[in-house]
């Protein structure tokens, strides 16, 4: 994200780099609740509602104002993550997710979605190298297989929006895959 934001800024673009859940003080507080390991099991519906609560705040406070100014927004995750994690990963009701998306996201949709795809074993190994796993990172392999499959299906169903990158390679190779996408983005008005 930082590499892409730097290249866009060098091309004269004003760029907001953000993440979900999070991106504002309130949304970051919700993120902390979502990700903190706890002895109390969080209900799946609670997780879904918290994700959308953080997103509503993020859209209102950061994303929509940036877009209204004509800024570019690079977000590490957005609504596709909800379909993957809460929809496929948790098996939550698709209609409920659709209704929440319509209520919260409305017509604020990405122009392009970059899917940094890695085999589940690679992703889990990378996460395992961090100091401590968060609540979601502690899930089992089957959970992450469902998530990856959902992302791949969404990318296949929306090829005009998604660009799939092989993120199992080293950082320089990932950046090499990003370069033509950056050039494509810079043709946008």
Predicted features along the sequence, with ranges:
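Hydrophobic/aromatic beta-strand patches that form the interior of the parallel beta-sheet core
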Residues: 18, 74, 112-114, 163-165
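A glycine- and Lys/Arg-enriched "phosphate-lid" helix/loop adjacent to the NTP-binding pocket
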Residues: 82-149
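Active-site donor-binding loop signature of nucleotide-sugar glycosyltransferases
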Residues: 20, 53, 118, 138, ...
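A generic structural signal for alpha->beta connector loops
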Residues: 12-14, 70, 110, 159-162
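Conserved anionic group-binding/transfer micro-motifs
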Residues: 51, 114, 174
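NTP-dependent small-molecule kinase module
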Residues: 3-7, 121-189
């Amino acid at each position: 994200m930082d590499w892409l934001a730097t290249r866009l800024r060098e091309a004269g673009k004003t760029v907001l780099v953000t993440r979900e859940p999070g991106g504002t003080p309130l949304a970051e507080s919700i993120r902390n609740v979502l990700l903190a390991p706890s002895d109390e099991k969080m209900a799946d519906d609670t997780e879904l509602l918290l994700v959308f609560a953080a997103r509503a705040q993020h859209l209102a406070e950061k994303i929509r104002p940036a877009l209204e100014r004509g800024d570019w927004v690079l977000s590490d995750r957005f609504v596709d993550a909800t379909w993957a994690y809460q929809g496929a990963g948790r098996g939550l009701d698709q209609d409920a997710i659709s209704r929440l998306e319509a209520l919260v996201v409305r017509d604020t949709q990405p122009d392009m979605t970059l899917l940094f795809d890695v085999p589940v074993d690679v992703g889990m190994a990378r996460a395992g190298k961090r100091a401590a796993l968060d609540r979601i990172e502690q899930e089992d392999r089957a959970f992450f297989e469902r998530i990856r499959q959902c992302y791949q299906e969404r990318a296949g169903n929306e090829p005009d929006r998604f660009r799939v990158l092989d993120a199992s390679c080293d950082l320089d190779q990932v950046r090499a895959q990003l370069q033509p996408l950056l050039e494509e983005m810079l043709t946008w008005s």
